[in-house]
Amino acid sequence: DLEQRGLLDETLIIWGGEFGRQPVFQGKNGGRDHNPKGFTYWMAGGGVNAGTDYGETDELGHEAVVNRHHIRDLHATILHLMGLDHEKLFYHYGGLDQRLTGVVPAAPIYPLIS
């Protein structure tokens, strides 16, 4: 166990995916399509503000309506927790500074960081 061994504070644990599922049943064959407008991540350890619930979806669970962020902001947060500055970590290609968070501005989600 990471906490028992004193390693939890320096180990970042992340569970999630880059999209959720539509909150309603679709079509005669069943199933639910991808939903990039509302999804879940679970984070613990390594600098994460423990016990934090952040953001909400609408009443149907279709899309985020409170504390909305693009996935690139989550990537910037993860890089920050790993001790990396996402704005300084880039390579120049095709006339653009290519970052792990993309070419569009991103920022760490500071309420998630302890």
Each language-model region and where it sits:
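Ligand-binding pockets and gating/stacking loops
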Residues: 1-114
